[in-house]
């Protein structure tokens, strides 16, 4: 077990070193509105940390919470409307599309990531994200690096996330 853990830690260190010299760090928001609240990962959460490790600026990085933070749509929009990327997780039979996202909540279309088609989704009904990623953060980090910095990790195929289709 120690050997496996050490190998994963080395993979993570190597991936972080890959993005460390980059001068550009794209911004990212995550998740979706659920009822009256949009639950975002706190700035001290594992998600926030892995976004930073992947060379991105998480728009709520300055938040002091380590868990989910319920926010009003307007708060997320104010801070995240110009984010370069948007990562969502959902569970449904077919993959989510831009059309469906717009039908779910029309104000989503105001986000730059929506307009520029830079939304990536993880369909947890098809992908073992919650079962796999806690034990393989190196795999998740690799996905995020490929999303945020597409010229890196040439030939790598995303494991958890896919770019939303129209």
Residue ranges and their predicted role:
Residues 13-98:
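Flexible, glycine-rich surface segments
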Residues 2, 20, 110-111:
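Short secondary-structure boundary/capping segments
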Residues 6, 88-166:
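Structured C-terminal subdomain patch of bacterial secreted/periplasmic proteins
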């Amino acid at each position: 077990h120690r050997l496996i853990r050490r190998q994963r830690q080395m993979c993570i260190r190597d991936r972080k070193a890959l993005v460390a010299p980059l001068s550009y760090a794209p911004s990212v928001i995550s998740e979706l509105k659920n009822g009256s609240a949009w639950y975002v990962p706190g700035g001290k959460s594992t998600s926030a940390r892995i976004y930073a490790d992947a060379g991105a600026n998480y728009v709520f990085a300055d938040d002091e919470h380590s868990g989910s933070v319920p926010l009003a749509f307007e708060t997320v929009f104010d801070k995240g409307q110009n984010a370069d990327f948007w990562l969502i997780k959902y569970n449904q039979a077919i993959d989510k599309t831009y059309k469906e996202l717009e039908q779910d909540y029309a104000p989503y279309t105001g986000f730059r990531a929506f307009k520029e088609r830079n939304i990536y989704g993880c369909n947890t009904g098809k992908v073992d994200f919650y079962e796999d990623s806690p034990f393989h953060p190196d795999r998740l980090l690799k996905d995020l690096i490929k999303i945020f910095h597409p010229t890196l990790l040439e030939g790598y195929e995303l494991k958890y996330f896919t770019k939303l289709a129209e």
